[in-house]
C-alpha cells in the first residue's frame, strides 16, 4: 500500500506542476508535456481504482492507454527539441539507446498491467502497477530535470 501511495504522489506531482511547466511551451515540447500529463492522470486514476477496488475491470483500458503513449515517447523527443520549457535532460539525446530502452520498459510493464487487470486478481494488478510506476520513476530519474518551482 505504501508503494501505491508513492505512485499516486508521483502522479500528483506530475499533474500539479504541469500547468506551470506548460506555460509558453509550443510544438513538440508542448505535445510531449501534454502526453506525459495524460499518463500522469491515467496513473493516478489507476491508483484510485486500486484503492477503492471498484473499477478494476477498467484498469486494463487505462493500462493500454499508458502503453500507447509510452510507445510514442521516443518520437516526442526528436533531436533539437530541447528548449527553455522542456523538462528533458540532455541525457535524452546523449544516451538515446538507454532512453529508448526505458520507454520500451514502460510499454512492456503497462502491457503486463493490462493483462493482470484482465485476470481480475487484485494482488497481481497491484504488484504490476508498482512495476509500472517504477518504470515511470526510472525514466524520470535518469532523463527528467527536477521540477521547476
Segments from the language model and where they lie:
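Bacterial N-terminal signal peptides that target proteins for export
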Residues: 1-8
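N-terminal signal peptide c-region/cleavage motif recognized by signal peptidases
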Residues: 16-18
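Extracytoplasmic c-type cytochrome modules immediately beyond a signal peptide or single-pass transmembrane anchor
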Residues: 23-131, 149
Amino acid at each position: 500500500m505504501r508503494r501505491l501511495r508513492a505512485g499516486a504522489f508521483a502522479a500528483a506531482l506530475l499533474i500539479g506542476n504541469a500547468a506551470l511547466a506548460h506555460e509558453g511551451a509550443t510544438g513538440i515540447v508542448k505535445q510531449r508535456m501534454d502526453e506525459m500529463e495524460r499518463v500522469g492522470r491515467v496513473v493516478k486514476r489507476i491508483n484510485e481504482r486500486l484503492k477503492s477496488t471498484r473499477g478494476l475491470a477498467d484498469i486494463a483500458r487505462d493500462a493500454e492507454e499508458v502503453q500507447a503513449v509510452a510507445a510514442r515517447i521516443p518520437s516526442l523527443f526528436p533531436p533539437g527539441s530541447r528548449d527553455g520549457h522542456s523538462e528533458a535532460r540532455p541525457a535524452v539525446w546523449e544516451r538515446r539507446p538507454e532512453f529508448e530502452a526505458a520507454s520500451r520498459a514502460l510499454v512492456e510493464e503497462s502491457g503486463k498491467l493490462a493483462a493482470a487487470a484482465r485476470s481480475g486478481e487484485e494482488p497481481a494488478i497491484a504488484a504490476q502497477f508498482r512495476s509500472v510506476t517504477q518504470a515511470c520513476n526510472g525514466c524520470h530519474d535518469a532523463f527528467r530535470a527536477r521540477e521547476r518551482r
